[in-house]
């Protein structure tokens, strides 16, 4: 597969393509790894520099510093790290300017990556690409205009995002969402997980209280209280809690006080492929899920698991968000499918009573979300060219010929 347009100068025989690529959290690292693989497939003579995690390092990147330093979320959480982040921003921008790459690609993490892009643009004409469009369709639409001052090209994960970016003056391509590339768990995978966890044939409720420490701290107690209301009506149901390594101990402490003898699906000590398989099997085995807001709703949709979404942030972030949010749902399944079938308990509505009531409603009619979940996967690109390769082609297609 070759770029659809003229082959860029940097991709011609005998010319090394130089790419500075920057990711700030695990989801961005996975996007970056797939994009790097796609770029190498289309343009074998490519050199990478930048910041990333295991997925990008497996594609040949030597990260300039640990990506974990950048995994910060929320207005209040960023403040204590401000001066350290400011130093890293300056260091990274200087590294880009010293490399003089054909393109700099930043992936999500806008608090960090767009500040790097601003310093780079102030001092050079280096082409900038940002992977993952900001959710200007949800809140703070003015971010697109500010972003257009430092970003030339956006790679969007969601099909409705390009017009928002283009109106601000940036080039934008929908390249598909990585969730569509995940293999489905087989019946054998699900049976093996049930046996391993001692679930037998019991119905399963999947609980996902977040992948960041602040999320777990805020959501896990509320989830536990909701389960105390919901589970007495469903005494045979087992609670399964997939975790990510960096919050596994924190989640284990929290769920120890939950009812229903919850079982953790812990990836620590496993090879990445095995850990991913167990997570997919847990999602597919579940009869319903209670999850924090975010990309996890798409993972559940990919597995066909009906869900309730719940989320709360700290008081200050909540008050700021209330003044800026412009949409009536934050769940990506609802947005992509243009439905509102996935119930939400957000902010002040994130209470045990509300969550338990919505779990009961979803459990009573689990098929109500099926059509929306299938449509979501179709619109995100399931069955088509892998998003990493589509993203790589989009980057190359828009480089100067």
Swiss-Prot record:
Q: Which domain of life is it from?
A: Bacteria
Which GO molecular function entries does the Swiss-Prot or TrEMBL record give?
Answer: lipid-A-disaccharide synthase activity; phospholipid binding
Keywords for this protein: Glycosyltransferase, Lipid A biosynthesis, Lipid biosynthesis, Lipid metabolism, Transferase
Its pathway, per UniProt, is:
Bacterial outer membrane biogenesis; LPS lipid A biosynthesis
Q: Which GO terms describe its biological process?
A: lipid A biosynthetic process
| Enzyme nomenclature, EC number | 2.4.1.182
Any single Pfam family the record assigns to this protein: LpxB
- Indicate whether Transferase appears among the record's keywords: yes
Q: Show the coiled coil region(s).
A: none
Q: Which EC class heads this enzyme's classification?
A: transferase
Q: What is the purpose of this protein?
A: Condensation of UDP-2,3-diacylglucosamine and 2,3-diacylglucosamine-1-phosphate to form lipid A disaccharide, a precursor of lipid A, a phosphorylated glycolipid that anchors the lipopolysaccharide to the outer membrane of the cell.
In which family does this protein belong, per the annotation? Belongs to the LpxB family.
Q: What is this protein called?
A: Lipid-A-disaccharide synthase
For this protein's source organism, the top of the classification is: Bacteria, Pseudomonadati, Pseudomonadota, Alphaproteobacteria, Rhodobacterales
Q: Which gene encodes it?
A: lpxB
